Amino acid sequence: MQAEAVTPKWTGHPLWLVGFRPFFPLAALAAALLPLVWMGVYSGKLPAPSLPMTVWHAHEMFYGFGLAVLGGFLLTATKNWVSVRGHYGRALQVLVAAWLAERLAVWFLGGSPAFLVLGNVFLVTLIALLMWTLIRYRDTDSYKDNFLFLIVLPLFLVAKALLLGGATFELGRDLTLGLFRMAFVVMLERTLPPFMKGAFQLTLPRIFVIDSAIKGLALALVFTPWLPTLLHSVLSLVLAGLLVTRFAYWSAHRTLPRLEIAVMYLGGLALTAELVISATSLKWVGALPVHLFSFGTMGLIIPAMMVRIAKGHTGRKVVFDRLDKLALGLMMVAFLARVVMPQVLPADYVRWLWVAACCWSACFALIAVRIMPLVLAPRVDGKEH
């Protein structure tokens, strides 16, 4: 608490008070644009970026959109976990400038010496800031399993290098997915119990052995690209079974009247489905495991979390109105169009891609409109951050 007392008060614009304020709108705007740009390139209506099309697509969805969300979330959460003021002001401005520079570099400068710098400054700086917070204030950390982030965060640098490495693209993609999966496993474990307590007055049972096994298996599966096929399949199926078991005794059925909480469970079940599908050798249309995770887990959970955090952390009551629920509904349609319908009607694959891209973009455009006024204004309860 002493550290917070001597921290100078930020007197600049409210946008720079805490990490989610600049990065959630940036992530939402990126998510609204990226699928439409991708479909424009995919269909030949737009010029291709400097990187190979598939590499650019995967990089921007994970390291553009995904890391803006994860970075904003962790910059906000870590300060609360260790009870300090956290990074704000100039530090956030530098991060945003680096993120914007990376978007331009990925499109225009892929493969050039300048890209090696501009394409990595954001990730390196973000990791350094987050790890500094977790290591410097580990004695006041309320979550002793935050050592998982000390493992996961630096591995994003390895995963990104592999993703951009040409012949190692699939290794990098799978490592990246495993790292995001690990982050979502931890986030769901920490957020669902208080959400269920607040919405339904339910105290979810915590079984240490199961919780620990889930995180341990998720960490092991980060290294999927280097695991023997049989071991990967066994670990994936065991983790899927444990997650389904926990969702069952965490009363997933009770969430149906509350869409904003139900999508959290649905996102977790999509993660489980991704594990099961990736454990099999069956052939599916359109990189199914990757899109189960991107549309199912990231797509369903992130919009709900953005709204919840943008309202709750600006001093407002967390209530999802009709427009918020419309955004979540649009993402559910996008999920069906991208994941389910290509398996049912593969002849219309490109049409389903367009439907999915448009619904995803509409969802995040609406989310951007909803949260922008909140992050640009001071807290309504008089608190600083």
Can you say where each PLM-predicted feature lies in the sequence?
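Hydrophobic alpha-helical transmembrane segments of multi-pass integral membrane proteins
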Residues: 1-385
